A protein has these predicted regions:
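Non-heme Fe(II) oxygenase catalytic core, chiefly the N-lobe of the double-stranded beta-helix
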Residues: 3-190, 198-200, 205
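Catalytic core of Fe(II)/2-oxoglutarate
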Residues: 189-259
Length: 259
């Protein structure tokens, strides 16, 4: 089994004038002026984490992400997602796998790789080819207030809470989701990732539709005992055979609460 590939990943370079970095996601097809920062390509080794599946270190708490296999869904057929049923199924899965008492899905994205196509329709987004974390801690708290009743938010925020993404291929075997293992229009806030040679990147090769990855995007436990979040990115696997169908995936983003 392959131990990894060498690939180009894209990292954020801060604005040269010291401004706070921003991106306008709904600015239309001309993306040249949608952000005030630049991207820096770096050639890195992306390790195949399938060779480490017996390692207890790759869990949500220790690494910030976790692969689950032999978990087929009945709500994706012929490339089409039955969203309502998939939501209900995913909530049940997340409660089972994390021990959470409450799970709230606040959005989803279906990504179908289409060269030359752009747009922010949640069913037509392209794979996100920049290293990033979906939510800062400030944005995580704002999500709780935005998506939960005002009377419920204080009690939920007083206990452990997280944002966790559930990422699953739709049809084709897919592996072009890079994960950084050692991770520390409404406006939102995300983390851009700068390159550091100490980073270690990995992926799960040839993921199937009966597999998914849980990706932690933020965490209320801030004492260093658990992983806070996982930077991630799409990337072009140079070993992909010519003519391979383009990647298709669905990612749901969830607020996860514990008693």
């Amino acid at each position: 089994m392959s131990s990894g590939v060498v690939a180009d990943l894209f990292f954020m370079q801060s604005p040269p004038n010291g401004e706070r970095a921003y991106i306008k996601n709904n600015a239309g097809p001309d993306t040249r002026n949608n952000r005030n920062y630049t991207l820096e390509p770096k050639t890195v080794t992306v390790e195949n984490y399938r060779t480490k599946l017996n390692s207890e270190s790759i869990t949500l708490d220790t690494a910030g992400f976790q692969l689950f296999s032999n978990r087929p869904t009945q709500f994706i057929k012929d490339g089409e997602v039955q969203v309502e049923g998939y939501y209900d199924e995913s909530i049940t899965l997340l409660k089972e796998l994390t021990g959470a008492s409450k799970v709230v899905i606040f959005d989803h994205t279906i990504r179908r790789r289409r060269p030359g196509e752009s747009g922010d329709n949640p069913d037509k987004r392209q794979p996100a080819a920049i290293a990033h974390v979906d939510q800062t801690f400030k944005a995580t708290i704002a999500r709780v207030h935005r998506h939960l009743p005002p009377e419920d938010a204080p009690g939920l925020l007083a206990k452990r809470f997280q944002i966790i993404n559930l990422w699953r291929p739709i049809e084709n075997p897919s592996d072009r989701l890079g994960l950084w293992r050692y991770a520390i229009s409404l406006a939102g806030e995300t983390y851009g990732v700068k390159y550091n040679e100490r980073q270690r990147w990995g992926y799960f090769k040839d993921m199937r539709p009966d597999e998914f990855v849980l990706i932690k995007c933020n965490e209320s436990v801030q004492d260093g005992s658990v992983a806070l979040y996982t930077p991630h990115t799409a990337f072009a696997d140079p070993t992909t055979p010519e003519g391979t169908p383009f990647r298709q995936s669905i990612e749901i983003r969830t607020l996860v609460f514990y008693d």
